[in-house]
């Protein structure tokens, strides 16, 4: 293929066109594929590429459009659905809102009705049934419900109640009482209406629900009453005129009556006009079912003596859960009643339980089916139906009974309404006439009824049926006139319809309520089924019998019960034959209404009867005028039929129920009946036979019945069966058995209803109250919750406050002990010496120490910082407050110190440098607080004292011997004075091992604090290198400040301050706490010391050997190593000082530390730098030195004891023999152990000799201070040791002796002062503290100040191998001498010394500042550090020191080291040996030697001489300083 197509044509090649592939593409499957792909047309034409692409584009476009449409449709559907849902939601919300509004309105109406409690009372009316009695009731009945529920005018078509204008006039006594009944019934119905959630139904709704009143005692207030179609409004009483124009209204009622029988109860066309006002139909059937408990077939003797059985009836109302509709205990043959809650459309399903066991089930289409009464379960059934009231047939029953056939509509109106009226009147007259004949019969029947026994004779029923048939036939024969009347009525206009409605209805009502035959006692006032309504509609004859006032419903119901559907058919036939449908239609609604009314207001039966009678008379008079014989048969037949039905109903009811009280009631009723008959006869005789119609007789009879009913009521009042609000089983039975008129039972029932209503109202009231209470309770719990929350919040706040307070407690209490724990903890966590983590370890160690002193609690730290800030920057008042709080916390938390120490130590190990800063701040705060609390001196004095101390350092700095002695003395003080400090030293050494650089940093800090120059020099060099300018400025300022401060400080002030301190110390809880801590610490230290001493004894020889070797190594080693050794020593010492409150006073350390931290923002850097220095210079040696130091310290603890013992001897050797005595002491104590220490001690002794004047004093003072501290520590630890120390001190100097004799608290004060308490209130003490604290501050600044210092120190160490050691010694000596001098000044309170010191300090500072010599540089370094500690600017110190000349420092230090002491010992080796001695024994061994040296030093040369010697030393050092360019560091 390729050969037939050149390569150039390959691009245009189309395989479809290739003839070689034609066969392939002609394949059906392939063609189908090509066609589907759009490459060819259906005809087989090959599409060009352009067409193909176009088609594909179109196809894609179509696809896209389809997708878009689909998506649009989808979204549209979603939107529509969403909108639909929103609409549904809105509708639901609207409905809910309407219901809520209706409920509120109903509640309002209910409240208004509740005000009319007399109307609703369950007892019969108390007042007379006269105009006076009912006038108010009428007003209430009409005004309150109408005003609240019927805003429409009275004449509105929907308002079926008579307007107020139609109220009967009081002049008509026969009619007066009727409105009362009406009003009462209306008020009741309005109440029921409101309860039934029809608050705005108006009067029509009231009328609709009136029939449910008789049953309301068993109805739930939340359930809608049954709305039955046959319930009509009650007409008003007849107008006083007595005229009735009925033609107007017959047509409308006829129209209203004829409606589909299948229409549901609540949707009847009769109420279409007002349907908008009644939104809901009844949810339940609400049929009142009366049943009888027939009893068990088998009775066991073991049954409970209570013969009653527990009956429960459950109904499945809507196909779901069963409801208990009845529960009670019944005797056999006892009836009970309950309300069916069947939902429309669901079957009527009942389950019967007897004593907890299910005995029967019933499931039928509706309640109406059982209206005739039947026994459930056959012959052996336990239950039977007595009657079913207010039941409406379901569709099935309607169809089965043929009730679905609509009645024939009336003919069109006739043209002449007058003829209609005449015909109607004639027909009514005939009815009346015929009634005259029927009434006697009826009376007889009623009498028979009353005497009816429990057995019902079938013959009577047959007779009644026959009579009914006869009456129907007669009515049929005379139906045409009735039809004409009906037609006339239909043609009649509506102008008088409204009023006449009520008038005629009133008339009917009277007759009905009396004649109705009380037949359905339980049916009374209870709506009857639509079937009955239909029957009424279908029986025009009966309905035309309106005048007879029979309750057609009751009558029909009776017929239904007796005859069933046959009667309904009969009625239909009658309807076809009769034409009086209009009359019947009118009569039926009104009769039903009147019946309802009579049922409701039965308590006023007499009134009703009288009203009915009067109405009848008036109507009879009217009718008699127009009476025509041809129309009489129809009413007569109807009345007969109705009477017969009533009789039958009553008999049937009576038959089904046992009547235990028949006789008494029968007698009463018989008597009443006889009386009534007599009265009727009289009435007939009085009136003409024409006018006296059967109605009158019936009225009289009803009257009589009512009277008898009243009597029966009186008798019945005590009957047990009458249970108000309960199920009236017995009363119904009694009434039925007696055949008593319905009025009788209705009175009771209405009373029960009233009671029920009252109870309902009460329940509602209580419910409302409960609601309110519940709401209030809901609110109350909210308030309570809020209160609780507030309380909790307050508690939490208080707790926080407490925590804040407690935090300070923790922060300040365990200062003394915590350092030990922290150190021990650090000791346990030994870390190899070379770890770079050393800086962090140092930070941690320092943090531990500070945490131990200041607490690790961040709150405590914050408080400490606040306290620091207060002490430095804020008013002393706040400081005092803070201090007081902190001190109090400190004192209070002594018991927690141990635990807190451990915790703080653990936390301290993990603390960051930030925590260290915070700790430093805490310490400073603590120290400042202590200082303030002790002396009341502001913390600012600390800076001054530190400045002074730095000046003193400068003054004394030039003197190496003094420095060496100072080291010795300080170390001796440390070692001898604080065996707990030994532990701390050891711990710190361990810490040093853990973090060699930490140890070094601490060493630097603590060496400086104790006068050890090495770390100070390194740190100073570092600072000098990086912060020359600032150092110079700050140093100058600091020096000037210090000079000024010193000038200001007077000896007397010093004395006063010291005295004040001494006086305050015992008072201050802090000090007590400190002393206690010291005691605890020393106790612990003693325990540890014993172990350590043993270890030291074992390791002593090794330590000596190591010390010698180390001394040699260090002598050979670069000054970095020496610095590290010194650092190691210093950290130990510093740790001792800082940890042991006896020596350094936590507060002083804290204070010095805090200013250092604050002054030295580069603390972390310094730590790192120092770490680097130590790593570079002598990490290994440091570790070794630390090990050696540790051993040395262990040995020192034992040597210290020896030194203490020997110290007594040496003390007596004389103060001037200090150089000799000191070496002697030192050699005596550790000589056998460490020869190098002996050399170091000799060097120290020589140094002391060279500085005998000044350093003798300085160290005498410092030594005394240290001795005192030692004594204090030892005294606390070991009384013997304390004694020895005191003896030594006494030997050394009487003043020292006196000072030593001061209480331990004073010693602790001095210790704290010597530590460099920023709080130094005694300014001499302040100097001493600055001496100690200054050095320590330098060390701390070396730690904190920094990164710069560390870097610079690293470089310096490399460069300053030899000179650095000497320089550090010099610095340390200066610091120590300075601190010694400060301490001596503080101790002895020598005004001269203070003044001289101030002057000498000024001179030295000035000389140092002017000369810029090497030694002055070193001195200034010390001063600078001290100044930094006091002023808080390490940078300035560094710069000034560097400006002064690091080279000279190095050289001068080298020379100083070479010079060693005034004796000419300038050998670095000797100095290094001395250093080694210090490093190994210094803390333990040197302490006794230094004590001895101090004992010799107490000689008090003038401070001026000391200063001069210092100056000479400085000059000599500067002259002898060999500044090699290698040592120079830019």
From Swiss-Prot:
Q: Which UniProt keywords apply?
A: Cell projection, Cytoplasm
Per the record, the coiled-coil ranges are none
Q: Where is this region: Disordered?
A: 165-187, 408-429, 475-661, 673-724, 773-870, 923-1146, 1167-1334, 1360-1383, 1425-1530
GO BP of this protein: cilium assembly
Biased-composition ranges, Polar residues, are 1517-1530
Pfam families documented for this protein: DUF4590
Q: Where is the composition biased (Basic and acidic residues)?
A: 415-429, 531-545, 552-562, 600-616, 684-717, 773-787, 979-992, 1039-1116, 1173-1212, 1464-1487, 1502-1511
Q: In which tissues is it expressed?
A: Expressed in dopaminergic and serotoninergic neurons.
Could you tell me where this protein is found in the cell?
Cell projection, Cilium; Cytoplasm
Q: Where is the composition biased (Low complexity)?
A: 581-592, 834-845, 1213-1225
Keyword field contains Transit peptide = no
Superkingdom assignment: Eukaryota
Give the InterPro entries listed for this entry. Answer: DUF4590, ERICH3
Per the record, GO CC terms? Answer: cytoplasm; non-motile cilium
Bias regions of kind Acidic residues — which residues?
563-574, 638-647, 943-958, 1289-1300
Function recorded in the entry: Component of the primary cilium that controls cilium formation and length. May function within retrograde intraflagellar transport (IFT)-associated pathways to remove signaling proteins from primary cilia. Also involved in neuronal vesicle biogenesis and neurotransmitter vesicular function.
Note the subunit structure: Interacts with CLTC/clathrin heavy chain 1, AP2A2/AP-2 complex subunit alpha-2, and PIK3C2A/phosphatidylinositol 4-phosphate 3-kinase C2 domain-containing subunit alpha.
Q: What is this protein called?
A: Glutamate-rich protein 3
Gene assigned in the entry: ERICH3
